[in-house]
Amino acid sequence: MLYTGTDIIEIRRIKAAQARWGKRFLNRIFTPAELSLCKDRLPSLAARFAAKEAVIKALSLPKNQSYSEIETLNLPDGQPSVNLYGQALAKAITLGIKQISVSLSHCREYAIAMVVAQD
């Protein structure tokens, strides 16, 4: 079975949240590895936020899902990949998910992510 999720976000929303709450916002949403990879590049952070939302939709995770349990990093070839932890991982195991593929993109104003999970 295939499970899909898509999300789009205005990059300015991530910028506004970072301006309002600073590092506290970033540390609540992103893992240390994601923050290190993105180096405060807002389009990249926004795309990873969209990926987290897309995973939540694909796996039908609860609305209070911890974003830090969903991590989007890059493989050595640059392709994005998803790592799950905690409750997100438990749900994926329950669904029999064997693979999660993610595609990220952004332009000046928006970032988008598409996730396909398969058992």
UniProtKB/Swiss-Prot annotation:
Provide the E.C. number(s) assigned to this enzyme: 2.7.8.7
Q: GO MF annotations for this entry?
A: holo-[acyl-carrier-protein] synthase activity; magnesium ion binding
Q: Does the keyword Lipid metabolism apply?
A: yes
Sequence positions that bind Mg(2+): D7, E53
Gene Ontology annotations of biological process type: fatty acid biosynthetic process
Q: Where in the cell is it found?
A: Cytoplasm
**One Pfam entry name:** ACPS
Which InterPro entries does this chain map to?
4-PPantetheinyl_Trfase_dom, 4-PPantetheinyl_Trfase_dom_sf, ACPS, Ppantetheine-prot_Trfase_dom
Q: Which family does it belong to?
A: Belongs to the P-Pant transferase superfamily. AcpS family.
What this protein is reported to do is described as:
Transfers the 4'-phosphopantetheine moiety from coenzyme A to a Ser of acyl-carrier-protein.
Q: Provide the protein name.
A: Holo-[acyl-carrier-protein] synthase
Q: Which organism is it from?
A: Dehalococcoides mccartyi (strain ATCC BAA-2266 / KCTC 15142 / 195)
